[in-house]
Amino acid sequence: MFSLEGGHAAATRLIRAGATGIVCASDPLALGAIRAARRAGLSVPADISVVGYDDSAFMSCTDPPLTTVRQPIEAIGRAAVAMLAGQIEGAAVSAEELFFEPEIVARGSTAAAPVKPRVLA
């Protein structure tokens, strides 16, 4: 499901429905969505915008460079280690929720929605 093929299949359905933007749950899904857009004769981002998630390695090197959401992995890891160390030392398990703010990494796969509606053959 979180593969290029899965992204291609899901995006194909969205493109046929007239979507002008697709936000994907992973970067590989987004690459599949870009492939589907191109196969439908669409330009990314002129006709449709695509956003990935995770800022995987080399996403700045794709064509177009992929706009993605970057998670604060280091901060999440530090918090997890601190919680685990506390539990190992006998601290009570906390019910506190931790929130981490992701970052949008704007690159070349997004633009304003097209002004004129498109017609697919």
Task: Tell where the protein language model's regions lie, with residue ranges.
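Structural motif
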Residues: 1-16
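Flexible loop/turn connectors
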Residues: 14-121
